[in-house]
């Protein structure tokens, strides 16, 4: 049994106006499902069920069993459009998962070993919190682990430094883009008002 499931219904009332009515009157989230050998489907889901699913970070990079009017299909989240102020989901895109066929997905990054550079007086900055990967459905990782324990002040972790799980390829690297993932820098020194006043008086 899939740990991540979502119920949906087909919708025929399309367009921006229809989507707004769904959200306002029925507390539904409009979405589209595409990919595989089937035609795209416009669907709607209960907003509260979508919110509950997304409470688990793993749902963003996990195969979801989508039940559309009694017909089940495996999908992954491709894109989410959120309200700019409130943060709730306004629209979702799902891509069908086909066994034996590679997919691309956005996977969260988990950083470990941050205590070591901090003890050396550094501060760790996360340049990115997620990565796009390409793999077969069976190899889709829940997250990508990045170890920063060996970093010194001034060091940077690039995507090429990160070990990809077996069967997984980083899309950015495949396109020649060696992204910065994290860096360690010296803490910024902020002078307080008394110090600045004393320096001003000395001048």
Curated annotation (Swiss-Prot):
Q: Which Gene3D superfamilies match?
A: Ribosomal protein L25, beta domain (2.170.120.20), Ribosomal Protein L25, Chain P (2.40.240.10)
- Name any GO cellular component annotation: cytosolic large ribosomal subunit
UniProt GO BP:
translation
Q: GO MF annotations for this entry?
A: 5S rRNA binding; structural constituent of ribosome
Keywords, sorted A to Z: Ribonucleoprotein, Ribosomal protein, RNA-binding, rRNA-binding
Query: What is the annotated role of this protein in its UniProt record?
Result: This is one of the proteins that binds to the 5S RNA in the ribosome where it forms part of the central protuberance.
The family note in this entry says: Belongs to the bacterial ribosomal protein bL25 family. CTC subfamily.
Instruction: Report the protein name in the record.
Output: Large ribosomal subunit protein bL25
Specify the species. Pseudomonas syringae pv. tomato (strain ATCC BAA-871 / DC3000)
Q: What is the lineage of its organism?
A: Bacteria, Pseudomonadati, Pseudomonadota, Gammaproteobacteria, Pseudomonadales
């Amino acid at each position: 049994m899939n740990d991540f499931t979502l119920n949906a219904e087909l919708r025929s009332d399309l367009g921006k106006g229809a989507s707004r009515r769904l959200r306002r009157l029925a507390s539904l989230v409009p979405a589209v499902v595409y990919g595989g050998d089937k035609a795209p489907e416009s669907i709607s889901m209960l907003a509260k069920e979508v919110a509950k699913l997304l409470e688990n970070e793993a749902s963003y990079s996990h195969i979801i069993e989508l039940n559309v009017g009694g017909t089940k299909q495996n999908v992954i989240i491709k894109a989410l459009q959120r309200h700019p102020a409130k943060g709730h989901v306004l629209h979702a895109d799902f891509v069908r998962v086909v066994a034996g066929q590679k997919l691309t997905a956005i996977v969260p990054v988990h950083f470990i070993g941050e205590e070591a550079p901090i003890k050396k007086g550094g501060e760790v900055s996360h340049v990115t919190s997620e990565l796009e990967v390409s793999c077969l459905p069976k190899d889709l990782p829940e997250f990508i682990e990045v170890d920063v324990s060996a970093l010194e002040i001034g060091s940077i972790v690039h995507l090429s430094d990160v070990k990809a799980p077996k069967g997984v390829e980083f899309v950015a690297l495949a396109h020649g883009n060696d992204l910065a993932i994290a860096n360690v820098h010296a803490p910024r020194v902020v002078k307080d008002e008394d110090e600045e006043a004393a320096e001003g008086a000395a001048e």
